[in-house]
């Protein structure tokens, strides 16, 4: 009699994905972030579900309902802060995951990579809409500023913005629809993540060397299940340290002031995980140009496979490319810092230089370095 794990139609799918899956024997901890993202998503859906049970998506009561969750609901405060800081952990894992893909050439799995980029956009949209829900000052003005960017689209821009708002300004209709979208999108993300995995399992995992590992595979369970559990424990430890000791560390104090359309905060800025893109947006003096730069800063990831000029897949044996990759990381950290600074000298100039460097590194310098490395192989 065959094992139920291998014969049952549902169990068979799980078995082939998480138990008997042949995995490369040499994948490092950088390959942990996929499972960590799955855990983050489940955690966000669960905490979000419990928050939605007590949240009110009406402009008059939204802010009070969040205060009520924190003060009166049993363990509401921990659910709220796990959800808010869980988003930060989600983005840390996301950026690490994408960085790993860029470093080790995982973008050569075209379908997996493209679904991943779509996932990144979807998660960013979800996080943005979630930030609007507490209806604090930064929620309101963040929503106003970011949705207003669409008015830069020629001809249809203004109509599009008013259609999204459901009126002539960010108001009750906007908050209600943002809540609806914020609730449904994580389930769409979960479905997309399954497609992401489906495409990945068509080819099998990449590994640090970038060389085919077909000759040296080990079963996913117990080797990588135990490794993923360790990663999960560290993730939960980091999250709970944040939640229990400094829950407001990454938030904005302005969001503890109820939304007021008549009073603009001195510095409007998004959550920390969007600051790099916000810095790129602000560094272009033209509105439409800024919006295009903002979209392209993420959409550029789609071009990664086309910009791969090296004969080797991974950067493991390519010191020049490694150097440029870590310069890119430093550049992104600089952009993140600039995004949180006021629009004044010297921050404007630093932001513009960092923005130019960002696109220059990805579009010109890294492909050039790869070609130089190809020539060095002939020596």
From Swiss-Prot:
Heme b b562 binds at residues 83, 182. One of its GO terms (biological process) is mitochondrial electron transport, ubiquinol to cytochrome c. InterPro entries: Cyt_b/b6_C, Cyt_b/b6_C_sf, Cyt_b/b6_N, Cytb/b6-like_sf, Cytochrome_b, Cytochrome_b_C_euk/bac, Cytochrome_b_N_euk/bac, Di-haem_cyt_TM. A ubiquinone binds at residue 201. It comes from the Eukaryota. CDD domains: cytochrome_b_C, Cytochrome_b_N. Keywords: Electron transport, Heme, Iron, Membrane, Metal-binding, Mitochondrion, Mitochondrion inner membrane, Respiratory chain, Transmembrane, Transmembrane helix, Transport, Ubiquinone. Heme b b566 binds at residues 97, 196. Pfam families: Cytochrom_B_C (PF00032), Cytochrome_B (PF00033). Component of the ubiquinol-cytochrome c reductase complex (complex III or cytochrome b-c1 complex) that is part of the mitochondrial respiratory chain. The b-c1 complex mediates electron transfer from ubiquinol to cytochrome c. Contributes to the generation of a proton gradient across the mitochondrial membrane that is then used for ATP synthesis. PANTHER family: CYTOCHROME B. Belongs to the cytochrome b family. Heme 1 (or BL or b562) is low-potential and absorbs at about 562 nm, and heme 2 (or BH or b566) is high-potential and absorbs at about 566 nm. This is Cytochrome b. It comes from Bubalus mindorensis.
